[in-house]
């Protein structure tokens, strides 16, 4: 049995009275999840909608608690870190992680960044050793597969695209993924939302098809090297 951790971050719901307000990223991720569950109903499923129920932002007291040795933390400091501990436990338990995110102002939503800030924590998800020279940080967790589902109003943020360098969502997710223990990463992308034309409709349809295909492939391969390889998948493909 595997554990699937699903994180949504759009402030919108999957289904609204006005369908124009439906979350695209959540709907694509849901296609992946539903397909996965069809193939692997026995797996543990953990879900958090950080867009609707955002984690607390870290603050000075949080940082102080993190850098206080475990045996010297006050009850208040332990309570301050309780949510962080819980979120880290969920990531640690996961074999497969699905993160859906819209692009807000060319980056990730603040709520998703808050989730990462609660998780990327010294001596929990990374350690620090200056003997490593200019790269003292090293992830602690490993062996996980990440599927990111992103949606954007514009297009062409990929390498060589017309907006290369202006989209910070996907690069940020790739950088932070190693602190979740990710060895293998797949990206599913939907674009053109602001244009509302055929390009957008085709992009969403293709993303949902990719999500379903990828979920089928991975859910049937949880015991082989497909989930445990050291490579990174393309943004639309299913092969790492």
Curated annotation (Swiss-Prot):
Cofactor mode of binding and number, as noted: Binds 1 FMN per subunit.
TM segment ranges: none
Keyword Oxidoreductase attributed: yes
EC number from the UniProt entry: 1.6.5.-, 1.7.1.17
Gene Ontology molecular functions: electron transfer activity; FMN binding; oxidoreductase activity, acting on NAD(P)H as acceptor; oxidoreductase activity, acting on NAD(P)H, quinone or similar compound as acceptor
Pfam families named in the record: Flavodoxin_2
SUPFAM superfamilies recorded: Flavoproteins
Keywords: Flavoprotein, FMN, NAD, Oxidoreductase
EC category name: oxidoreductase
Catalysed reactions listed for this entry: 2 a quinone + NADH + H(+) = 2 a 1,4-benzosemiquinone + NAD(+); N,N-dimethyl-1,4-phenylenediamine + anthranilate + 2 NAD(+) = 2-(4-dimethylaminophenyl)diazenylbenzoate + 2 NADH + 2 H(+)
Binding-site residues for FMN, renumbered to this chain: 10, 23-25
Cofactor(s) needed by this chain: FMN
Protein purpose: Quinone reductase that provides resistance to thiol-specific stress caused by electrophilic quinones. Also exhibits azoreductase activity. Catalyzes the reductive cleavage of the azo bond in aromatic azo compounds to the corresponding amines.
Entry similarity comment: Belongs to the azoreductase type 1 family.
Description of how the protein assembles with itself and partners: Homodimer.
Protein name in the entry: FMN-dependent NADH:quinone oxidoreductase 2
